[in-house]
Amino acid sequence: MARAFLFVLDSFGIGGAADAERYGDAGANTLAHIAEACAEGRADRERLRQGPLFVPHMASLGLGKAAETATGLGFAHFGTDLIANAFHGAAQEVSSGKDTPSGHWEIAGLPVRFDWGYFPDTVPAFPADLTAAMIREGEVPGILGNCHAPGTEIIERFGEEHIRTGKPICYTSVDSVLQIAAHEVHFGLDRLYEFCQVVRRLVDPLRIGRVIARPFVGETAATFQRTYNRHDYAVPPPEPTLLDRLTARGSRVIAVGKIGDIFAHRGISEVRKAAGNMAMFDKALGAMDDAGDGDLVFANFVDFDTEFGHRRDVAGYAAALEAFDRRLPEAFARLRQGDLLILTADHGNDPTWRGTDHTRERIPVIGMGPGLAGGDIGLRTTFADIGETVAEHLGLAPGRHGTSFHAMIGGHA
């Protein structure tokens, strides 16, 4: 049997989504706009990075070719030399959302065919009966925020009042989410998690995808900083995913980063977390070392999204891509005959785009494996093709959604 490694660069879209206009995202392209900014010197930052976007290892897997597949336009920012056993293509999402659970579930073979619940962009954003229940059942003196807002901004705005009053900061966005920020010391981390579990139960009837604990530290608006003790409380997938199918067979699924939270810990054998992309990469490499035949390592690199996409930090996003790319040879070196490595994304978050929210984009599907023929897998009509390919590679029977491209890259289950 073989092994599979699925690395999700959270929010690393490549434009071209056929339905982008419906979301107000026509023209959004995370990769292309970062590359353009770098080429024009607009992403230079002293002691961080300079010059054109330099990601030679992802380019050698066909990232530029994937970008051309996504948009139908040329992509001149990378060279065209590809390694022999690499494959490249792009995928269009069929799930209605442009959020983290929808993207990851679809990657794992389960498109989201229902509509998530959302909160309106009003003040207050939450229904009065929900707010009352949160206060009563969560045993808090009230809540702050109750609106749409970027996370760092709302902590700056309400953090000091939160410390004085003990009221948690509750907010939302265009995603199906209710986020709760609280101070790790003054409110307490365990208390925040307990409050989020109460809220998770209360919003279940509203089909809200995630309740997210957003702890922070600091004593003033100028010093507040979110920590890496974030925890997502997600709705469980409504039917088995690739992860469930693997663990039911007896294979291990090692979740790196927030993968366990995204799947409500369904189909997960082990969770490995760390703070920051580079520490997460260390965890992914360790999981690769420990994976046995038939196992899947599923890793999410969240900083691209939370630290740079939402914050519209082009230089930071570019530097993070370059740092990630520099580590890829360490992953390549761990691949053995019969292994499959796929790099992809779950949605876009163009740091040059208006607002602070995700962008509807196609995603790259690039990768390699010793013994594979590689090649062009074209435009996949659903992210679920990724999950089906991993399933076939690991010897599972076909699932209900998606079409494997395993044969196209010369794979043999």
Swiss-Prot record:
Keyword presence, Manganese: yes
Compartment(s) of residence: Cytoplasm
Binding site for Mn(2+) 2: 305, 310, 358
One Gene Ontology term, aspect cellular component: cytosol
Residues that coordinate or bind Mn(2+) 1: 10, 346-347
Pathway(s) annotated for this protein in UniProt: Carbohydrate degradation; 2-deoxy-D-ribose 1-phosphate degradation; D-glyceraldehyde 3-phosphate and acetaldehyde from 2-deoxy-alpha-D-ribose 1-phosphate: step 1/2
Cofactor(s) it depends on: Mn(2+)
CDD domains: PPM
Cofactor stoichiometry and binding remark: Binds 2 manganese ions.
GO biological process: 2-deoxyribose 1-phosphate catabolic process; 5-phosphoribose 1-diphosphate biosynthetic process; metabolic compound salvage; nucleotide metabolic process
Pfam families: Metalloenzyme (PF01676)
Primary location group: cytoplasm
Enzyme type, top EC level: isomerase
Superkingdom classification of source: Bacteria
Catalyses which reaction(s): 2-deoxy-alpha-D-ribose 1-phosphate = 2-deoxy-D-ribose 5-phosphate; alpha-D-ribose 1-phosphate = D-ribose 5-phosphate
Molecular function in Gene Ontology: magnesium ion binding; manganese ion binding; phosphopentomutase activity
Family matches, as NCBIfam families: deoB, PRK05362.1
Family: Belongs to the phosphopentomutase family.
Classification via HAMAP family: Phosphopentomut (MF_00740)
Record function comment: Isomerase that catalyzes the conversion of deoxy-ribose 1-phosphate (dRib-1-P) and ribose 1-phosphate (Rib-1-P) to deoxy-ribose 5-phosphate (dRib-5-P) and ribose 5-phosphate (Rib-5-P), respectively.
Record-given protein name: Phosphopentomutase
Encoding gene, per UniProt annotation: deoB
